[in-house]
């Protein structure tokens, strides 16, 4: 496994106020990953928490449950507004929530990233697997161990969406400006390169 090669300077660490949506799912491993990088992490459960951060991760989990809880906690419009102004990264179920079309009538995605997704397209829980694929970070192509758990598939990429990672020909990592999505779970490995890449993403210029 490739080791992380980007090291944040001590005087930069306090600048990162990372939020992780903590309604359900795989938020704690993301927290640990960012804390290893010296970041301040907030587990986001309400609008007040959103106001404390400058970037957000929507983690993996059960997308139908996350969808319901977003509405239950009145977070839908605040999340849309946040995603229009600041960096957001969606992993697995988070990718589904950021997409324009989830292919599932039970899910009303946030429609922030111009992609379509298909739930569980790489199989259900018993079909979870890992595969080494290619990612492009800062213009360089490298290998990355990708862990897929009931992973969604990106079925359409919009014109403004850049493919940054592929596995067997499928795009499994993509970026649209200040928004990032991955079908796989980088937080389930010890490789922090994608977490570091997300930290370097800038909000849109106003």
Report residues per predicted region.
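Cysteine-nucleophile active-site neighborhood
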Residues: 63-134
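Redox-cofactor binding/interface segments in oxidoreductases and associated redox assembly factors
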Residues: 58, 90, 182
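Amide-donor transfer/coupling interface in amidating biosynthetic enzymes
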Residues: 2-9, 119-206
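A secondary-structure boundary/capping signal
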Residues: 23, 91-93, 113, 150, ...
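N-terminal beta1-alpha1 cap of cysteine-dependent amidohydrolase-like domains
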Residues: 1-72, 78-81, 192-196, 200-206
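Flexible, glycine-rich phosphate/dinucleotide-binding loops
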Residues: 27, 50, 97, 104, ...
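Hydrophobic anchor at the start of a short beta-strand
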Residues: 41-42, 88, 179
């Amino acid at each position: 496994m490739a080791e992380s090669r980007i090291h944040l300077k001590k005087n930069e660490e306090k600048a990162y106020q990372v939020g992780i949506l903590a309604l359900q799912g795989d938020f704690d491993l993301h927290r640990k990953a960012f804390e290893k990088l010296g970041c301040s992490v907030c587990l986001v459960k309400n609008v007040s928490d959103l106001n404390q951060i400058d970037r957000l991760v929507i983690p993996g989990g059960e997308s139908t449950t996350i969808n319901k809880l977003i509405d239950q906690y009145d977070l839908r419009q605040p999340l849309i507004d946040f995603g229009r102004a600041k960096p957001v990264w969606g992993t697995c179920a988070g990718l589904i929530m950021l997409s324009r079309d989830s292919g599932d009538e039970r899910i009303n995605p946030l429609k922030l990233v111009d992609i379509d997704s298909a739930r569980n397209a790489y199989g259900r829980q018993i079909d979870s697997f890992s595969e080494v694929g290619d990612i492009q970070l800062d213009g360089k192509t490298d290998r990355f161990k990708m862990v897929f758990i009931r992973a969604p598939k990106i079925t359409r990429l919009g014109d403004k969406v850049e493919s940054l990672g592929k596995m067997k020909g499928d795009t499994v990592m993509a970026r649209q400006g200040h928004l990032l999505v991955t079908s796989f779970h980088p937080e389930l490995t010890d490789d922090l390169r994608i977490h570091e890449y997300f930290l370097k993403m800038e909000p849109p210029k106003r």
